[in-house]
């Protein structure tokens, strides 16, 4: 088995690459950690990896064949994705990589579809007794309300709407927007909960972090806390069919 690892969309994830390198050599002294990026020269993490490869955009029809070729030529045994837009295409091609003895650290396709479409995500959470913001009729709204795209990422196209004047026709006409009650941050604290699931689909680790500062939808400054959230989540999401590796869930909790 090949022990080299490749981390995709390296970007600014310097600490992540360094952690993988430091850990990997404890088990396989000669193993290397490679990276990919659309623009390696401008990716800080590329410079701390053992080599960075320029790749196409993940939505390009040739992306998978290019990535597979890189993996074969560099004896890659594991692919570690880092952004949510990669997950669907990698999950769809998981078997292709497995057939070439390459493990893709991504959950099964059905679970990825649940996560990538917030309409499905809401149904999933409710089935596991986790409350979600109530849906709002955009033509008969109660203010304030919140709107976000069902397939959104990086905190883009979000709308905090305080009154009828702010509910513009452009917002009403956007077919991707979901409308819901606004959750007041003065009443609830916001957390990102990092979780790790094994190949048996059972949770192995739960780490809640209070979200203090956000950058492009990701927590930039946070505080790790031990709180009732750990037991709350363990009781409800102890096992998720098709879930493997790292996932995170964002919650409001008081």
Residue ranges, per PLM feature:
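Flexible, glycine-rich phosphate/dinucleotide-binding loops
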Residues: 14, 42, 153, 167, ...
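Short gly/pro/ser/thr-enriched loop/turn and capping motifs at secondary-structure boundaries
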Residues: 41-43, 87, 110-114, 214
